[in-house]
Amino acid sequence: MSDPNMDLNGRVYAITGGALGIGRCLTEELTRRGAQVALIDKEADTGRALAEQLKREGGNVLFVPGDVAEEEALQNFVGRTAETFGGVDVLVNNACLHRQGLLTPCGYEDFNYVLRVGVTAPYMLTRLFLPYFRKGASVINITSTRAFMSQADTESYSAAKGGISALTHAMAVSLAGRVRVNAIAPGWIDTGAYHDPAYRPDYTRADAAQHPSGRVGTPQDIFRAVLFLSDGENSFIDGETLTVDGGMTRRMIYTGDEGWAYTV
């Protein structure tokens, strides 16, 4: 298993959606361990503030404002990253969003916007970064357990996550011998503290108990998974999806089990 305190000095990570949530955690943790980080996010003020904070701490960070749903923004991100760092060791396709589904309803433009952010952008960025990937480079796609299970009215997000999951194994085969491509499927990850510094979680006993691990996930859980998959010592892992959900999707529950009932 990769050491979460490993020195990443000189390694270049490119992260989409790197200003908030899981992406912010990755940006902070990787930079503080010596990695050079390029991030893109449409939250321009938040992204700039994060980059400036990390630079004051001695980090080497490039923030590029932009919406990954737009091809021009993707090209600009790749160009700026290559110009600043020369090459890339790890691309983390993290950005996504949801705009509900059939019951809301989610219309044509909204549905396609989610797919552009969650599927088209990862494909295009991988393609655009190809000339700049260094030896032993890897792509890590952030999918979700919602790629293979759902709640009602989540079609836009589920479709995007299903798409990036399929894209992962397809790209791994296409880039065999050049770039490893893997995915991480988070379950319930509480990102509140990476949106609001004053946030304090307030979980019920059931919130924790529904996870066989006995707790709700944190962005650091995903950070550790990113370290693991991007470690060159784990080069035999390719085209795989690593589920990080505390075992939640492995628990089978029928109505009447463990005091649980389905309301109809």
Q: Model features per residue range: what roles?
A:
Residues 183, 202-237, 244-246:
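C-terminal helical subdomain
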Residues 131, 172-177, 235:
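Alpha-helical segment proximal to the catalytic Tyr-Lys
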Residues 102-103, 107-112, 207:
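Substrate-binding pocket helix/loop in short-chain dehydrogenase/reductase
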Residues 144:
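Residue(s) in the substrate-gating loop at a strand-loop-helix junction
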Residues 126, 160, 168:
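Active-site helix of classical SDR
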Residues 7-38:
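Canonical Rossmann dinucleotide-binding motif of NAD(H)/NADP(H)-dependent dehydrogenases/reductases
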Residues 2-5, 149, 238-264:
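Short C-terminal tail/terminal secondary-structure segment
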